[in-house]
């Protein structure tokens, strides 16, 4: 049958590149299911749930990058408020498996059942992506770091050692998910196997020569998922258009999933766009990619599905401060997401919708602490223009039911009266509804182009606007012009203004249209004969012209909201873009496929989280950040409005809406960061230091399973000894004289190291944004050498394990070779090495925060960063009584600073707080600093490398109604020492249903005496 579908595809392609015809015969595409259930089905057009088609507009968030479960509601309510029908998340094997005998889905933020329950409550489908490999700019791509020794093979294959390693985690994840599937009335829609594993073929995929190892691996994963209760469709995501893996339309070679998908980052997944040239070619802003031909060639009988489409980009070390939001701005969201619709995509998930924070040692070396990703929801949880721009399209796709079943009829400049503008015509073969997606012919050009559009409608061919004005594309912009758009029992014949949404109250539709501020629009409603202006806020030039079967309305909309009423019962709300940004359509149902009778319309607030109606009362939950006028379009039965549980005084407008005023939230002032104390955190540099305690391990392996053996022995790879994160300390002993040492150390991009001999500082590798391995020859001054035993201390950090095939790249000392000026005899050798890292190693001493939270610094091993530690004997820093602290010291060492600061944030507010770290102008920059908040490492600040200075810390990590322990570990890599300025600030205050005061109880365990043994 495949050749028949490809023949049909060829015929469709001819239509696609030809001038549009009004009608197209409907092609009979096969309807697929996975043989286990018919609840979820799919075909050439879209996914279906219980026989209903749905446009899947989804966005990614990572629960492990915001380890406060109460805040998952905040993120997911903001996702729902955009109009998204789904969300996606990677699970992290590493986050749940601190060692090879533990899988933890119950402790603290590792219990993910609230996510599944929220999906059901809020009414969104889930795309669950368990890995076992996820990439995600996570250390080792989400693999647990105990897997990095080489003893489990080369990974991501059918090696029995690797299979035995991933099976417990993957089985647990599948079993948890199995309780929350669409097939059982819950909300998991699909289950992704592996991640960007485009390895099905050896050589050119067109030759279809299967990679049997990769096929066997995928079949093992699929079997495990099914054996552990997964009945929803299994999916995959190709990393690019070249690999063509795991789709049954392409081949039946083995290992195929039910629905294959394609990932795409047309503007580059990182702020360093040079990293994407091998995939995307030369970077040209706003250059688009053709996906239609790919999907028609590779999976013509499946939906055009993009499990990852660019929602932003991560900021690498030394990237611009604050990332590169200009690369994936609101304009990007406007153009590229509409482009996908023009390409007939009906299922796409934005990566990321909320990025979060690489707290602790979660990150791969490619990025620093922030994982803001320039996503629509910022790292500090605020929403802005990009979020609002995304919402304009998501609400449209939720309400445009005919968009879930379209054929591509044609594209080109022949649709317009301006050759600088082209259009793509999509048409529903059953209803004849049309969607004309318009762009600049050259999308990289952002000028202002005006045009008319040739469309086919149920009343014949028209050129619109008919009466006056032109359609405008101003800047990097796209517009979707609809024809024969269903409004309940009415029909929008066409509109040059974009549809935001519509609702039906008492069998009468309320249509919401928007245009950029100051632009004009024209629309036509079938069956209407006359109309009137009921509210003309900002609207001018309104004209009604009756045609034979429809009424044409022209308008120009400045700032504001206007309301028109037509004689056939249609109410039309006209918005400019600014007003549309503050317009919401909260659902009254927990069904993700929201119908037009199951929503209300709200204008004004910063955020509307939810709505429900009980008798005559409409209960709204949301956020207000300023004094706001609330306007509501709802059923006539609604007489009272509550906002966050409190009734608000309302008034009725002549055109049927309700209005109320929301007060501004109070200002929040943070207390001063003063009363700092400090202590030395590098006693290990001293010869008198005793390293015989349980914090230290003898590093004595003479063989390794790692595929990259060291140049000298013993093996000094930290992972071999169970220490996987950040800073590690090596003490190498030797007897007699040596003139120096050659050291070659590997720790990932932006890593650094320092060395001391017998307590005397030698030198450091400060690190660069791109250097992952650094060697130096250090000279030993004869004055500090002992004739007998000498101790060389090496302190090095790493910035995480590399991703994909680089995951096994070792972290530690690749070569340590003593040197001698005496050429008559061999140079001395190290007698033995001792190693210290995270307190307890893989034993997971702090299961709430987890093994990624701590490094091996003395301060961390001793628990100085934890609440409740007694620092009364420490040195007082006597900071100035202001909202900042300047902390400094001289000498190459590590010093730990600590302060306890109370907060008393009132209930009923959502407050976001960030720390700001900076280096005073005259202070040295050759240092590394780590920020700790109530025991959590929430910032890595390297002023000589990276540009991140703002570190958001969420409520729940911060105690908003109690004392907060703030710590700074500062590692000076030169004798000049270090100077650091510490501030904090309020990002926003919202009167909110999300009352964050009191969040995080149980997430901030305190200091215990057990820490003392790790000195």
Curated annotation (Swiss-Prot):
Its EC number is 3.2.1.23. Its main location: secreted. Glycans are attached at residues 23, 99-100, 172, 211, 411, 456, 554, 679, 735, 775, 821. It is found in: Secreted. One of its GO terms (molecular function) is beta-galactosidase activity. The keyword Glycoprotein applies. Pfam families: BetaGal_ABD2, BetaGal_dom2, BetaGal_dom3, Glyco_hydro_35. Keywords: Carbohydrate metabolism, Disulfide bond, Glycoprotein, Glycosidase, Hydrolase, Polysaccharide degradation, Secreted, Signal. Residues 1-20 form the signal peptide. This is Probable beta-galactosidase B. GO terms for biological process: galactose catabolic process; polysaccharide catabolic process. Disulfide bonds join 271-324. Cleaves beta-linked terminal galactosyl residues from gangliosides, glycoproteins, and glycosaminoglycans. The active site is at 196 (proton donor), 308 (nucleophile). It comes from Aspergillus fumigatus (strain ATCC MYA-4609 / CBS 101355 / FGSC A1100 / Af293) (Neosartorya fumigata). It catalyses: Hydrolysis of terminal non-reducing beta-D-galactose residues in beta-D-galactosides. Belongs to the glycosyl hydrolase 35 family. The keyword S-adenosyl-L-methionine does not apply. Substrate binds at residues 90, 135-137, 195, 265, 373. One of its GO terms (cellular component) is vacuole. It is an enzyme of class 3 (hydrolase). Transmembrane segments: none annotated.
């Amino acid at each position: 049958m495949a050749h028949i579908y490809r023949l049909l595809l060829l015929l469709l392609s001819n239509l696609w590149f030809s001038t549009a015809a009004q009608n197209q015969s409907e092609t009979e595409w096969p309807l697929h299911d996975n043989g286990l259930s018919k609840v979820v089905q799919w075909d050439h057009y879209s996914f279906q749930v219980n026989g209903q088609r749905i446009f899947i507009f989804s966005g990614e968030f990572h629960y492990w990058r915001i380890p406060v479960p109460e805040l998952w509601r905040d993120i997911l309510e903001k996702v729902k408020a955009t109009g998204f029908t789904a969300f996606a998340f990677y699970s992290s094997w590493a986050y749940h498996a601190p060692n090879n005998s533990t899988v933890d889905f119950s402790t603290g933020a590792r219990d993910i059942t609230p996510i599944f329950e929220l999906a059901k409550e809020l009414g969104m489908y889930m795309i669950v992506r368990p890995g076992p490999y996820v990439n995600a700019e996570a250390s080792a791509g989400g693999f647990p770091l105990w897997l990095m020794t080489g003893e489990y093979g080369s990974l991501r294959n059918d090696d029995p050692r690797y299979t035995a390693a991933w099976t417990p985690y993957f089985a647990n994840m599948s079993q948890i998910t199995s309780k929350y599937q669409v097939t059982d009335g819950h909300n998991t829609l699909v289950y992704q196997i592996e991640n960007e594993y485009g390895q099905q073929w050896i050589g050119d995929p067109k030759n279809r020569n299967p990679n049997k190892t990769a096929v066997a691996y995928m079949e093992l994963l699929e079997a495990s998922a099914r054996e552990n209760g997964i009945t929803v469709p299994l999916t995959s995501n190709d990393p690019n258009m070249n690999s063509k893996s795991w789709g049954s339309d392409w081949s039946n070679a083995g290992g195929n999933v039910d629905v294959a998908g394609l990932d795409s980052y047309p503007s580059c997944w990182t702020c360093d766009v040079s990293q994407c040239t091998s995939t995307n070619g030369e970077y040209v802003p706003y250059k688009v990619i053709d996906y239609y031909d790919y999907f028609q060639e590779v999976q013509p009988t499946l939906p055009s599905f993009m499990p990852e489409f660019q929602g932003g980009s991560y900021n690498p070390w030394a990237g611009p401060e604050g990332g590169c939001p200009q690369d994936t701005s609101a304009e990007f969201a406007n153009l590229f997401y509409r482009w996908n619709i023009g390409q007939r995509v009906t299922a796409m998930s934005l990566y990321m919708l909320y990025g979060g924070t690489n707290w602790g040692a979660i990150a791969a070396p490619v990025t620093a602490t922030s994982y803001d990703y320039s996503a629509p929801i910022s790292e500090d949880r605020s929403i802005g223009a990009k979020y609002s721009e995304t919402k304009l399209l998501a609400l449209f796709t939720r309400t445009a039911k005919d968009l879930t079943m379209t054929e591509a009829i044609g594209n080109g400049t022949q649709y317009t009266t301006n050759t600088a503008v082209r259009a793509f015509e999509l048409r529903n073969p059953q209803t004849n509804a049309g969607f004309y997606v318009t762009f600049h012919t050259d999308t990289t050009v952002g000028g202002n182009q005006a045009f008319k559009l040739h469309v086919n409608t149920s009343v014949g061919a028209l050129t619109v606007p008919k009466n006056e004005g032109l359609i405008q594309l101003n800047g990097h912009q796209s517009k979707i012009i609809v024809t024969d758009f269903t409004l309940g029992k009415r029909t929008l014949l066409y509109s040059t203004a974009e549809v935001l949404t519509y609702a039906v109250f008492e069998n009468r539709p309320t249509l919401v249209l928007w245009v950029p501020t100051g632009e004009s629009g024209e629309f036509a409603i079938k069956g209407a004969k006359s109309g009137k202006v009921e509210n003309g806020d900002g609207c001018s030039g309104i004209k009604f012209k009756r045609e034979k079967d429809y009424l044409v309305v022209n308008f120009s909309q400045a700032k504001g909201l206007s309301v028109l009423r037509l004689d056939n019962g249609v109410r039309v709300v006209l918005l400019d873009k600014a007003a549309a940004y503050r317009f919401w359509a909260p659902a009254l149902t927990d069904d993700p496929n929201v119908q037009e009778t199951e929503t209300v319309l709200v204008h004004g607030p910063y955020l509307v989280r939810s709505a429900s109606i009980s008798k005559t009362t409409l209960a709204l939950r949301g956020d207000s950040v300023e004094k706001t006028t609330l306007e509501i379009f709802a059923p006539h039965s609604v007489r009272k409005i509550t906002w966050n549980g409190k009734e608000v005084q309302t008034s009725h407008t002549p055109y049927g809406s309700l209005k109320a005023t929301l007060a501004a939230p109070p200002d929040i002032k943070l207390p001063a960061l003063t009363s700092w104390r400090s202590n030395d955190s590098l006693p290990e540099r001293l010869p008198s230091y005793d390293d015989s305690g349980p914090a230290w391990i003898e590093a004595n392996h003479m063989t390794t399973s790692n595929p990259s053996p060291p140049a000298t022995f013993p093996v000094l790879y930290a992972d071999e000894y169970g220490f996987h994160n950040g800073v590690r300390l090596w003490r190498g002993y030797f007897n007699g004289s040596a003139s120096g040492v050659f050291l070659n150390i590997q720790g990932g991009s932006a890593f650094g190291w320092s060395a001391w001999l017998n307590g005397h500082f030698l030198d450091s590798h400060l690190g660069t944004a791109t250097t992952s391995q650094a060697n130096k020859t250090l000279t030993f001054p004869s004055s500090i050498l002992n004739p007998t035993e000498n101790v060389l201390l090496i302190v090095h950090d790493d910035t995480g394990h590399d991703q994909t095939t680089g995951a096994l790249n070792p972290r530690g000392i690749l070569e340590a070779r003593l040197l001698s000026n005496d050429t008559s005899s061999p140079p001395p050798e190290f007698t033995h090495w001792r190693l210290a890292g995270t307190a307890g190693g893989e034993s997971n001493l702090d299961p709430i925060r987890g093994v990624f939270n701590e490094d091996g610094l003395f301060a961390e091993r001793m628990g100085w960063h934890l609440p409740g530690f007694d620092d009364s004997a420490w040195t007082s820093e006597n900071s100035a009584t202001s909202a900042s602290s300047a902390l400094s010291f001289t000498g190459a060492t590590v010093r730990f600073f600590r302060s306890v600061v109370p907060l008393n944030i009132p209930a009923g507010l959502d407050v976001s707080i960030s720390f700001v770290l900076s280096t005073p102008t005259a202070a040295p920059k050759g240092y590394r600093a780590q920020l700790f908040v109530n025991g959590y490492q929430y910032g890595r600040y390297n002023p000589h490398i990276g540009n991140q200075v703002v570190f958001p810390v969420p409520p729940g990590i911060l105690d908003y109604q109690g004392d907060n322990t703030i710590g700074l570990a500062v590692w000076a890599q030169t004798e000049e020492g270090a100077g650091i300025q510490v501030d904090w600030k309020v990002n926003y205050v919202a009167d909110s249903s999300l009352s964050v005061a009191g969040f995080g109880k149980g997430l901030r365990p305190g200091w215990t005496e057990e820490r003392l043994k790790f000195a």
